[in-house]
Every structure is written in structure tokens, then in C-alpha cells.
């Protein structure tokens, strides 16, 4: 695994995007809608580490509550704090307690795939997933496509059934975050050409 989660941090390529779209059976706007809502379409922090969100309730469940305490391990969601480097501070605390469970308790990359879903994303273990996520946004998006197919959410994306997609991808509390509404809005913008220029991002 790359030291401190730093790999090549290569930006999304046109070929990588096209491969994911073909795998999913969608066009560009559907994919950009998801990526825009999850990470504003960027899978890496400025320092080159993958975008993550550490989720304390997942860590609590995976460790059977052995470390329940404050912001890194609790039965209830929340306590995330700001996005960005702060999430790695939280992850570091969890890593010192149970490394594998900690990696599984964070969502990773451009589509924020949970580490515990590594198998559905196409990896033999979470360590392999994190290593790939640290290298390229192409690998991050490929993992998203694999997960959507394995979870049968690809059909909802193809049909623009944003409510069903939001429920499956974001969880039962999706409405609190207006997740489906935001997806619909981002899709509308992407459908009229408001999408990132991959050549500029490269």
C-alpha cells in the first residue's frame, strides 16, 4: 500500500471514463451526476491522497463496539467534522486500534466507495482497494462501476430513478441530505454540457 496513502494520484482520463460508461451502459451525464454530488468530481485532495470520509458507526459495527468513544467509534452516524485532511486524522486514530476495520470504515475516492464494499468494487481485500484508489481516478471510477453493477444500482442509474439510486447508494437517510434532489439537479446540468473538461484536469 502506498506510504501514507500517497500514490501517483493520476487524474481521470477520457479512456477511463469511457470504459466506465460502457460498463455501466450509461452516457456521461449520469456518471457526472453521481461524481458531482459525492466529491464535486475530484477523487484526490491537493496533497495527493484520496478523498475519504471516515464513518464512526461503521467502525463501531465492524469492531463490535470495542472502541466506542467520541468521534472515531460510536453506534450513531455523525461527528464527521470537516472534509479533507481532518478525515485522515480520524482514520489514523482508528488505524491504531484495528487497521483493517478502519480501512473498511472509510469511503474512498471520486465516488466514495466504502472500504467494506471492496469485494463488490472488484478487489480481493480492502488493502488492494485502497492501494488502487491511491493511484488513479480511473481506478476509482472503475471501482464505482463495479460496485453499481454488483449492487444492481446500475439499472436505477440507467433509468434515472434518482430516488431508488439515492436509497441504495447513500443509504436510508438519503432524503435528509436531499441526495436524490441533488442528483437530479446535477444530471440536468450535465445533460446540457456542464461537465468537467478531462483534458484540462489531466
List the model feature ranges, each with a label.
Residues 1-196:
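Catalytic glycan-binding domains that act on GlcNAc-containing polysaccharides
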